[in-house]
C-alpha cells in the first residue's frame, strides 16, 4: 500500500518542526541544496520513528524541482508540501537571493500545484521583512503575483540596478512570495487543494543567528526587544500555525499570509519611536 508523500524543501529547524507535527505515517522527502543538511534532518526524523529520505535539490532550478517531484510521486500521492528554503540577506548576493527566494518559490508553487492531491495543502515560509517593504503599486503587485516564473526576473522592479542591497532583494522576494500564494491559491483550488504562507519574525534558527551575529545584528536585537512580545520566536511557534493550515481545521483558509513576529512589525510602524 502506497503512503502519501510529504515534501519539505529547506532542511532547517522550522521545516523539521512542521513535518514532525503533520507527516507521521507519510513518506517524507527532505530536500535541500546541501545534501548533508537534508541528511542531518532526515537522520533526526528517522530516529524519531518517521519514514524520511534525503534529497539534493536546487530550488533555483526548475529541472531540479521536477526531479524531486517525480521521486516523491513514486512514493505516493503528494498530500502536503512545506517550503522552508531560502537565503537571508547576509548569506548571498542580490541576484542569488532573487533566484532562490523569489524565482525558486514561484516555480515550487507552480510545479507542486500541478501534482498536489485533492484535499492536499501547502505552506511556504515567507518573512516579516516583506511586510516592511513600502507599498508597491497595484500594477507591481499584479506583476509579482501573475508573471510567469521564467519572466519574473526580467521585470523592471527586479533589475539589479533598481535593487539597493541584499535586504531590499530579500524584501521584494518575500513580498512576491505572498502575492504568488494568493494567485496560485486560485489554481490550487481547481484541484481541491490549498496553499498559504507564513511570515515569521526573528525565529531562533541557524539562519536567524547568521543575521543576529552579522552586520545588521544590533538592528535585529533592538527590533525584538521593542516588540510587544519582547523576544525572538521559536520554530515550534511557527509550526503551531502551519499545523492548522495543513489540517482539516484550516479547510477554509487558502491564499492567505500569517504574520507571526511577536508584534515586531506593529512596533515598527506604530511603536513609541513612531508616535
Where do the language-model regions lie?
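Canonical Rossmann dinucleotide-binding motif of NAD(H)/NADP(H)-dependent dehydrogenases/reductases
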Residues: 1-29
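Short, small/polar-rich loop/turn modules that mediate ligand/substrate recognition or access, typified
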Residues: 194, 253-255
Amino acid at each position: 500500500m502506497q503512503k502519501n508523500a510529504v515534501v519539505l524543501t529547506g532542511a532547517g529547524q522550522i521545516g523539521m518542526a512542521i513535518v514532525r507535527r503533520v507527516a507521521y505515517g507519510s513518506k517524507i522527502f527532505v530536500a535541500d541544496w546541501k545534501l548533508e543538511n537534508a541528511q542531518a534532518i532526515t537522520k533526526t526524523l528517522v530516529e524519531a520513528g518517521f519514514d524520511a529520505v534525503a534529497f539534493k535539490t536546487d530550488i533555483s532550478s526548475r529541472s531540479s524541482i521536477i526531479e524531486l517531484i517525480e521521486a516523491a510521486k513514486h512514493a505516493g500521492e503528494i498530500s502536503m508540501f512545506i517550503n522552508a528554503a531560502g537565503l537571508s540577506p547576509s548569506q548571498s548576493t542580490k541576484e542569488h537571493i532573487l533566484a532562490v527566494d523569489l524565482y525558486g518559490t514561484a516555480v515550487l508553487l507552480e510545479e507542486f500545484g500541478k501534482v498536489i492531491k485533492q484535499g492536499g495543502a501547502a505552506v511556504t515560509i515567507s518573512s516579516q521583512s516583506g511586510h516592511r517593504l513600502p507599498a508597491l503599486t497595484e500594477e507591481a503587485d499584479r506583476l509579482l503575483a501573475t508573471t510567469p516564473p521564467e519572466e519574473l526576473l526580467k521585470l523592471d522592479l527586479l533589475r539589479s540596478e533598481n535593487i539597493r542591497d541584499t535586504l531590499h532583494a530579500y524584501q521584494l522576494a518575500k513580498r512576491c512570495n505572498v502575492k504568488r500564494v494568493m494567485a496560485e491559491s486560485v489554481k490550487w483550488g481547481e484541484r481541491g487543494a490549498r496553499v498559504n504562507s507564513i511570515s515569521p519574525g526573528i525565529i531562533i534558527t541557524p539562519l536567524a543567528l547568521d543575521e543576529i551575529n552579522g552586520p545588521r545584528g544590533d538592528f535585529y536585537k533592538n527590533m525584538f526587544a521593542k516588540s510587544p512580545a519582547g523576544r525572538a520566536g521559536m520554530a515550534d511557534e511557527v509550526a503551531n500555525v502551519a499545523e492548522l493550515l495543513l489540517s482539516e481545521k484550516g479547510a477554509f483558509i487558502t491564499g492567505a499570509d500569517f504574520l507571526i513576529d511577536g508584534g515586531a512589525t506593529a512596533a515598527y510602524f506604530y511603536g513609541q519611536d513612531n508616535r
